[in-house]
Amino acid sequence: MLTFLIPTAKEMKPVPPCYPHQLPQKSLPILEAMAELSLEELARAYSISIEAASKEAKRLKAIAQGQSPAYPAYQLFNGLMYRHLKRDNLSKAQQDYLSKQVYITSSFYGIIPTDEKIAEHRHDFHTKVTINGQSLKHYWRPIYDQFAKDHKQIISLLSSEFKDVFSKEYQKLWISPKFMEERSGQLKTHSTISKKARGAFLTACLENNVQTKEALKQLSFAGFCYNEELSTETDYYYIKKES
């Protein structure tokens, strides 16, 4: 069975219904460390304005007091990749695929199933906070590595920010899809191409119930097709040809 890893997104959009929120035990020290920061320190930790930090402080307080509503993570996150992922009108099989084979890597919640109920929050691995003297990456690394150890065939749709939380010995075992577009005879890639393509790729996987590496190579989605010439054992290249 294939296991997919995807990143969080800064943009969030609450979609009813909401649910009670239960913060995982491992997330509590992070919440406590963030709650100890002054408004100025919080602004520096997030690299945002005081006004924006005030909004985050209220969110953190609501989470700490158990008053924050929670939403399925794949519905709450609303970045470019998530907007290009099929999230509505899923069949039972597609919903099962999304909730049982796709996991979100979070600097606040750890590695969670896509349908895990989470609260609105602002947090990533660039957030400047230490937990018992450790950076966020070092704090989560044992748990991330254990996940990689327990899941033999990982398909990584992670950016380097999230990928680097894992020890390199696990990273080198993954399959990492790469997405490029052909323009004026040249192959181009940038974050917008990659983010949109990740969502379309994952949609194709759940719609076709892809379970093997060979099936990944047969996929065609949003104009992208597998390119055997560029691909390696661990990097699968998908190219969108000029029309």
Swiss-Prot record:
GO terms for biological process: response to hydroperoxide. GO terms for cellular component: cytosol. It holds the Pfam family H2O2_YaaD. Belongs to the UPF0246 family. PANTHER family: PEROXIDE STRESS RESISTANCE PROTEIN YAAA, PEROXIDE STRESS RESPONSE PROTEIN YAAA. NCBIfam families: PRK02101.1-4 (NF002543). This is UPF0246 protein SZO_18530. It comes from Streptococcus equi subsp. zooepidemicus (strain H70). The lineage of its organism: Bacteria, Bacillati, Bacillota, Bacilli, Lactobacillales.
